[in-house]
UniProtKB/Swiss-Prot annotation:
Keywords: Cell inner membrane, Cell membrane, Lipid transport, Membrane, Transmembrane, Transmembrane helix, Transport. Catalyzes the facilitated diffusion of 2-acyl-glycero-3-phosphoethanolamine (2-acyl-GPE) into the cell. GO terms for molecular function: lysophospholipid:sodium symporter activity. GO terms for cellular component: plasma membrane. The keyword Transferase does not apply. InterPro entries: LysoPLipid__transptr_LplT (IPR023727), MFS (IPR011701), MFS_trans_sf (IPR036259). Belongs to the major facilitator superfamily. LplT (TC 2.A.1.42) family. The keyword Cell membrane applies. The gene is lplT. It is found in: Cell inner membrane. This is Lysophospholipid transporter LplT.
Length: 406
């Protein structure tokens, strides 16, 4: 579809509405299942340090499958790829429901999620264009965060009420997501005709990695989103252990409600980014990234529920404002160089490598007995410094460009 035709279409086209609905149900299932499965492994008396291992098994599938999922997203109609991926998530949820190993079941959900991600973001570049793409990303993030908000809370509350009911609801929601994908119009494959031999696919993927990491703008986007999502998933697990220590509450619902506050904030931040940031002014998001680390440090020292809610909403606002423009930048640049699906697969590799590293470090310090408040403070300080270094590095790169003779 030509860029002129896309520019003339309304943002909330039939295609866009179908994608947003499918994404909502899929993300709802992901988040409800995470907290229901965490409740299950607590009930089965797994040690505290095993909780991040659950997420590490999930993100490891992204890393292993990274060379293949981008080409799959670009080689087939993306709506159908999303449908099959949601079917794999449904299968993983059923594995857990039927009492098999929860780590195995959640890893199968990870396989579906790894295949789903390049397709869901890559399709945005096929149904929107130009500055609409930033707004489309904002709407995608809003849909995702609304699902995180409702799914996380539903998973925690249902798990406190009846654990098997919580797991059954997760499977049902994935089934609805599969059906919702049928309403996404079938679009032509973005890049058909590529080799499907694993060796050729791996070589093609690492060529895409090299091209994206060599370009200063896409490298900036990849580094920023990797740091953000690595920190975000670690914060989720930090909250599970922080709540009993700081607030004296030992249920499953409170950590999910606190995670929901971050989700509410991200919706607001994503909307602000769509309003105030364009592809030409992406660097406006960097101060928000530094402030995320500052706010996490302040949050870790709280013992008041109202202040915890307020600070997590602020963290979410800053997070939405930070990550949405970076996603849009990568999709726009990647679409014209390596294909949107490959670009998102490379992004997923970076983000999930960061998640695996941060979760592994977090699991280690918890196993070593570090106080959870001290872990939170250190985590916030390190994140703020990392984004500040990224900001300084990007500023230096820009200065070098302006000094080069034309």
């Amino acid at each position: 579809m030509s860029q002129d035709v896309l520019a003339d279409k309304p943002l909330l086209s039939r295609s866009m509405v179908a994608v947003l609905c499918a994404q909502f149900f899929s993300a709802f299932g992901d988040n409800a299942l995470l907290f229901a499965t965490l409740a299950l492994i607590k009930q089965q008396l797994y040690p505290d340090w095993s909780q991040p291992i659950l997420q590490m098994a999930f993100v490891a599938t992204y890393i292993v499958l990274a060379p293949f999922v981008g080409q799959i997203a670009d080689g087939f109609a993306k709506g159908r790829v999303m449908m099959v991926a949601n079917g794999l998530k449904l299968a993983g949820a059923l594995v857990i429901c039927f009492g098999l190993n929860p780590f195995l079941g959640y890893s199968l959900v990870g396989v579906g999620a790894a295949a789903y991600s390049p397709a869901k973001y890559g399709i945005l570049g096929e149904i929107t264009s130009g500055e609409q793409l930033v707004k489309a990303n904002g709407m995608m993030e809003a849909s995702t965060i609304a699902a995180i908000l409702l799914g996380s809370v539903a998973g925690g509350i249902l798990a406190d009420w009846h654990l098997m009911a919580a797991l059954g609801v997760c499977a049902l929601v994935y089934a609805i997501a599969v059906i919702a994908n049928l309403f996404i119009p079938r679009l032509a494959a973005a890049r058909s005709g590529a080799s499907w031999r694993p060796r050729a696919m791996t070589g093609s993927f690492f060529t895409a990695c090299r091209l994206l990491w060599q370009d200063s703008e896409t490298r900036f986007s990849l580094a920023g989103t990797s740091l953000f999502w690595g920190a975000g998933v670690t914060l989720r697990f930090l909250l599970v252990l922080w709540v009993p220590v700081a607030l004296g509450i030992a249920d499953n619902a409170t950590p999910t409600l606190l995670n929901a506050m971050v989700a509410i904030g991200i919706v607001v931040g994503a909307g602000a980014a769509a309003r105030f940031v364009t592809l030409k002014t992406v660097k406006r998001c960097l101060p928000a990234g530094v402030l995320i680390g500052v706010m996490v440090t302040i949050f870790s020292l709280q013992n008041s529920m109202p202040m915890a809610y307020l600070l997590l909403i602020i963290i979410g606002i800053l997070g939405g404002f930070f990550v949405v423009p970076l996603n849009a930048l990568l999709q726009e640049r990647g679409k014209h160089s390596v294909g949107a699906g490959n670009a998102i697969a490379v992004q997923n590799l970076g983000e999930n490598t960061a998640m695996l590293f941060m979760l592994g470090l977090y699991s280690l310090v918890v196993k070593l007995g570090a106080p959870v408040v001290a872990v939170g403070v250190g985590f916030g300080v390190v994140f703020a410094l990392a984004i500040a270094l990224l900001w300084g590095w990007q500023w230096r790169q820009q200065r070098q460009k302006t000094r080069q003779p034309e």
